[in-house]
Amino acid sequence: MIAVDAWKPADGLTLEPNALRAAKERELSLALTAGPGAGKTEMLAQRADFLLRTGTCRYPKRILAISFKVDASSNLKERVKRRCGSELASRFDSYTFHAFAKRIIDRFRPVLTGEYALDVGYKIADR
């Protein structure tokens, strides 16, 4: 674990001042909006690196990132792993909305009864 003041963006990256402040924010939730290719994924990876390596996100707490697309989800997970290592990255979960919803259904499927009951090998139908 490193001190909050000692944290610097991984991979020798230099973040512009507003991005650096956002990456190091410890009290507020943030909304990050920008166009394609503006660096949103990298910003999220750096923020996760900060939260995990400084202990701001203390064990056993985890970080959840939800994306629309599979490639965005896996890209973000891989970036976090490269920045803070496998051990800390194991506390970073990155899913698509559909994959996250399926995890919830799988976890609570045994308690669904009546018309909501699902078989063990249930399938999700296409549209």
Predicted regions span which residues?
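P-loop NTPase Walker
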Residues: 1-115
